[in-house]
């Protein structure tokens, strides 16, 4: 198979509308000084934060120096596990603002619930920290744009946790799409078929000992505590999460847009609902969304199903791209296959991963945001397209959107849902 140069990869993986964002080659750790040790704080350590800790601790000259979590039980257990595994002490903090005051911290890695992502990242930029932030980078479109502005204003490195962008195979797949391997690519499909069980309705209950419930809620409106919210099922409540299209689906929305070389759409139509469980989830179990790009002659289809369901060409979670000479199947984060012509003859294929954490650290060390594989601009777009679909679903109608102004056309009701009511002092400001 042809070997790709850095110039090849850069041309293939940078959308024309975002041409400043380069896809780098991997930089060896020997390129940096032996004393150039990076100190990272991980904020939110109960879910994805565990992977963040593992990922950063596996890198040369990188130290996870601080763990931060609003649940003291989780925090102490996490610190104990860290010290046992790595044979070193780690600082602990309940309040992320204390972390940002620590001038010895070079970068923060944010793995909180969705409603905290953008504000935590904006505060970090304002404090002079570089940021790795889990997907989605924002809970609504407004705060995604504010995060882009903050990263620019404070000249910070901000990486989004969409690790498939660092996959060698996926970078190669995008290059094939750009070069016309499957012809004119007119449609991308994202599939999110994951088991999401009945969560019941546990009602309200006393706040567990050790949990700072006020700080957990942060920007969200105050509610009584429920075990249905903490620690994972907050995903299914609009105040904190964005449903599965804004959870797992961000990987797939991001890849749809990357592969089609498009930004935000002009029309959005979503339909779905709750059909399986009589539980207290607010977000849909099933969601089918169509995003149209009439000027480019392209369309994105996103499909969320909770199981049981068929696979699509072997894919449960992934993407399919359709062209006039064939189609491409991307299964997960590190694998692609192509099928060419009317007889669907097998074409180029590859399975190969990458290291998204290392890519972030390389960019931080080099002080060069162009090295990022998952830059803040694409983070905003991948999250915002999911938010647009959710708004269409919640309003029950097709919406018309102006991608340049990032607002709906003549629709006050829909535009009001591009942001949220914030709870002081946890406010994403208009001027960052």
Indicate residue ranges for each PLM-predicted region.
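N-terminal secretory signal peptides and thylakoid transit peptides that target proteins
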Residues: 1-17
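N-terminal Rossmann-like dinucleotide-binding module
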Residues: 13-85, 164-167, 256
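Pocket-flanking alpha-helical
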Residues: 50-54, 75-80, 97-98, 118-123, ...
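Conserved SAM-binding strand-loop segment of SAM-dependent methyltransferases
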Residues: 90-95
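N-terminal Rossmann-like NAD(P) cofactor-binding module of classical short-chain dehydrogenase/reductase
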Residues: 108-109
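Beta-strand-loop-alpha-helix segment that lines the small-molecule cofactor/substrate pocket
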Residues: 113-114, 118-166, 180
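Hydrophobic or amphipathic alpha-helical targeting/insertion segments
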Residues: 159, 175-176, 185
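Contiguous beta-strand/loop segments that form the cofactor/metal-binding neighborhood of enzyme cores
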Residues: 172, 181-184, 189-335, 342-432
């Amino acid at each position: 198979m042809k070997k790709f140069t850095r110039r090849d990869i850069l041309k293939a993986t940078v959308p024309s509308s975002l041409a400043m964002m380069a896809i780098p080659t991997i930089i060896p750790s020997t390129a940096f000084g032996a004393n150039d040790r990076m100190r990272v704080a991980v904020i939110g350590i109960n879910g994805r934060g565990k992977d963040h800790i593992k990922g950063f601790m596996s890198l040369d000259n990188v130290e996870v120096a601080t763990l931060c979590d609003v649940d003291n039980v989780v925090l102490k257990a996490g610190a104990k596990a860290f010290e046992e595994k790595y044979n070193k002490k780690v600082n602990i903090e309940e309040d992320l603002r204390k972390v940002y005051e620590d001038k010895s911290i070079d970068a923060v890695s944010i793995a909180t619930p969705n409603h905290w992502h953008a504000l935590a990242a904006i505060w970090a930029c304002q404090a002079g920290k570089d940021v790795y932030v889990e997907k989605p980078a924002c809970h609504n479109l407004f705060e995604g744009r504010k995060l882009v502005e903050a990263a620019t204003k404070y000249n910070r490195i901000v990486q989004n946790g969409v690790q498939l962008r660092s996959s060698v195979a996926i970078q190669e797949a995008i290059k094939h799409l750009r070069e016309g391997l499957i012809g004119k690519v007119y449609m991308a499909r994202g599939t999110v078929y994951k088991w999401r069980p009945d969560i019941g309705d546990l009602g309200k209950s006393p706040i567990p000992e050790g949990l700072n419930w006020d700080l957990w809620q942060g920007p969200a409106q105050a509610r009584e505590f429920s075990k249905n919210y903490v620690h994972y099922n907050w995903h299914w409540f609009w105040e904190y999460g964005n449903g599965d299209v804004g959870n797992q689906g961000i990987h797939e929305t991001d890849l749809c847009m990357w592969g089609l070389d498009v930004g935000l759409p002009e029309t959005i139509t979503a339909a779905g609902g709750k059909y399986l469980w009589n539980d207290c989830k607010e977000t849909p179990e099933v969601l089918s969304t169509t995003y149209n790009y009439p000027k480019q002659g392209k369309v994105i289809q996103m499909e969320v199903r909770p199981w049981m369901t068929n696979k699509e060409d072997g894919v449960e979670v992934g993407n399919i791209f359709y062209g006039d000479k064939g189609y491409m199947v991307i299964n997960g984060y590190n694998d692609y296959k192509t099928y060419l012509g009317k007889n669907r003859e097998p074409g180029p294929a590859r399975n190969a991963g990458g290291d998204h954490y290392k890519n972030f650290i390389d960019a931080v060390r080099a002080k060069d945001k162009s090295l990022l594989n998952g830059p803040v601009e694409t983070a905003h777009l991948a999250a915002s397209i999911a938010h647009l679909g959710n708004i269409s679903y919640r309003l029950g109608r097709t919406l018309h959107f102006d991608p340049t102004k990032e607002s709906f056309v003549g629709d006050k009701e829909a535009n009001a849902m591009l942001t949220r009511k914030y709870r002081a002092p946890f406010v994403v400001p208009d001027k960052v």
